[in-house]
UniProtKB/Swiss-Prot annotation:
<comment type="function">
    <text>Single strand-specific metallo-endoribonuclease involved in late-stage 70S ribosome quality control and in maturation of the 3' terminus of the 16S rRNA.</text>
</comment>
<keyword id="KW-0540">Nuclease</keyword>
<keyword id="KW-0378">Hydrolase</keyword>
<dbReference type="Pfam" id="PF02130">
    <property type="entry name" value="YbeY"/>
</dbReference>
<keyword id="KW-0690">Ribosome biogenesis</keyword>
<dbReference type="GO" id="GO:0004521">
    <property type="term" value="F:RNA endonuclease activity"/>
</dbReference>
<feature type="binding site">
    <location>
        <position position="113"/>
    </location>
    <ligand>
        <name>Zn(2+)</name>
    </ligand>
</feature>
<dbReference type="GO" id="GO:0004222">
    <property type="term" value="F:metalloendopeptidase activity"/>
</dbReference>
<comment type="similarity">
    <text>Belongs to the endoribonuclease YbeY family.</text>
</comment>
<dbReference type="GO" id="GO:0008270">
    <property type="term" value="F:zinc ion binding"/>
</dbReference>
<keyword id="KW-0862">Zinc</keyword>
<keyword id="KW-0255">Endonuclease</keyword>
<keyword id="KW-0963">Cytoplasm</keyword>
<feature type="binding site">
    <location>
        <position position="117"/>
    </location>
    <ligand>
        <name>Zn(2+)</name>
    </ligand>
</feature>
<dbReference type="InterPro" id="IPR023091">
    <property type="entry name" value="MetalPrtase_cat_dom_sf_prd"/>
</dbReference>
<dbReference type="GO" id="GO:0006364">
    <property type="term" value="P:rRNA processing"/>
</dbReference>
<keyword id="KW-0479">Metal-binding</keyword>
Length: 152
């Protein structure tokens, strides 16, 4: 299977919460996870942030006053997907712990999830869309060697 081209910028906020995850997210792994979720070529920036920046962005752009695990800002879907994915390190860490996953497993899942959003996938439009997105995410993650992220 030929993978699509990816121009990747990987950023870590100057925040202890974000930089603590640098070792978990080597550039080659992040690129591999994202490329497996791409149906088109893409230019993607991944930014790992702390709780304060994550909450500010979620409040400003989604009008929800809390830090969330991943925010996707998609600017263009075709012919090249252009997007920013912002992941909040302390939220990802807490969720991984609560779900008995490694940080790597949870980051891989959220990066695949965000990449699908960048290409127009949406799980908030209908139950059917949510189910289709979950099935596709699971297939991609299993192809990458990860377990089903939705298994109980």
């Amino acid at each position: 299977m030929a993978l699509n081209q990816l121009s990747l910028s990987l950023q870590f906020a100057r925040d202890a919460e974000a930089t603590a995850h640098r070792a978990t997210l080597p550039r080659h792994a992040v690129a591999r996870w994202i490329r497996h979720a791409l149906a088109v070529d893409a230019e993607i920036t991944v930014r790992i942030v702390g709780a304060e920046e994550g909450q500010r962005l979620n409040r400003e752009f989604r009008h929800k006053d809390y830090a969330t695990n991943v925010l996707t800002f998609d600017y263009q879907q075709e012919p090249v997907a252009v997007a920013d994915l912002v992941l909040c390190a302390p939220v990802v860490e807490r969720e991984a712990r609560e779900q008995n996953k490694t940080l790597e497993e949870h980051y891989a899942h959220l990066l695949v999830h965000g990449t699908l959003h960048a290409q127009g996938w949406d799980h908030e439009t209908s139950e059917q869309d949510a189910q289709e997105m979950e099935v596709y995410e699971t297939a991609i993650l299993q192809e990458l060697g990860f377990a089903d992220p939705y298994a109980a």
